[in-house]
Regions:
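N-terminal presequence-like segments and the immediate start of the first folded domain
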Residues: 1-164, 169-278
Length: 278
């Protein structure tokens, strides 16, 4: 079966109730016949102290629920459109050619998939100390975590094909420095450690009410010549990584551009999966 048929994304919601009850109801909706790679919860904590305590509770519940098959866990402080808590699940239906390993780096779970197409990494929930540090320090801490994981598993930086970046109060300024630009500068510094001949990742870079800096990513190393990635841009738009200084805010007198493509496709033989940025 083709990778495009085996990977699956779904959204689950539940009506407003106590936080623990909502988490239990969402976990109970997840299918038992699939491998769960990523769980991204979206909710509305009242402050960062409650955000951290709920993130810890989520981790405990997910670990108890999945045991040695703990998926990537992300908690985003954004109000769901409907219901009290929303869950985005990334799932996979393996066949005999797939080898799936659930691992940890520090306290962060991640998933490795290996098959005839290549090696695939699903990771995230990467965050810094949202209580005691600002956006700049958190951004540096997050990319240090990303770097450590990629190095550990043998994935080059430019193997990242999709990245999700959630930034607390994204347009807010710390003095003269905008949160989004602070994050962009940290990302640019990290990405500058390699070359990107095949384009930057597709990416989400959006605001969150709370939670500091939060990053998820997918990476791929292909071993089959019929499998590859292709960057996609819109000719009616300026590429994000080519923005002029006029549309960027400065942070520490730096105006590095957002490093992402409008989309990126993964080809598997005669099939394609497209990651759309936004």
């Amino acid at each position: 079966m083709n990778y495009c048929d085996k990977i699956n994304y779904n959204i689950y919601s539940t009506e407003k109730a106590g936080f623990e009850e909502m988490v239990d109801k969402l976990l109970a909706q997840l299918p038992r016949d699939k491998q769960i790679f990523r769980l991204a919860f979206f909710g509305t904590p009242s402050d960062n102290e409650q955000y951290v305590s709920r993130r810890i509770l989520l981790r405990e519940k997910v670990r108890k629920y999945y045991g040695n098959h703990e998926p990537v866990l992300t908690y985003v402080s954004q109000p769901p459109l409907n219901g009290g808590l929303l869950l985005e699940a990334h799932m996979y239906t393996p066949d005999e050619g797939d080898h799936i390993t659930y691992k940890h780096i520090g306290t962060f779970p991640y998933v490795l998939l290996e098959n005839g197409s290549g090696r695939f990494l699903f990771a995230g929930g990467f965050h810094g100390d949202v209580i005691n540090f600002g956006i700049e320090q958190q951004s540096k801490e997050v990319f240090k975590l990303v770097s450590d994981l990629l190095r550990k598993e043998g994935f080059p930086i430019n193997s990242i094909i999709r990245q999700w970046n959630y930034i607390e109060q994204i347009t807010k300024f710390d003095g003269e420095d905008q949160h989004y630009q602070i994050f962009n500068n940290a990302r640019s510094d990290y990405y500058a450690m390699t070359t990107w001949e095949n384009g930057y990742p597709a990416a989400t870079g959006i605001g969150a009410n709370l939670g500091g800096i939060l990053v998820d990513l997918d990476a791929a190393l292909f071993s089959n010549p019929d499998c590859y990635t292709t960057p996609i841009d819109n000719k009616l738009q300026v590429a994000a990584h080519a923005y002029s200084d006029g549309v960027l805010e400065a942070a520490h007198c730096k105006k590095t551009t957002p490093k992402f493509e409008r989309a990126k496709s993964m080809t598997f033989g005669d099939r394609e999966l497209v990651y759309i940025s936004g």
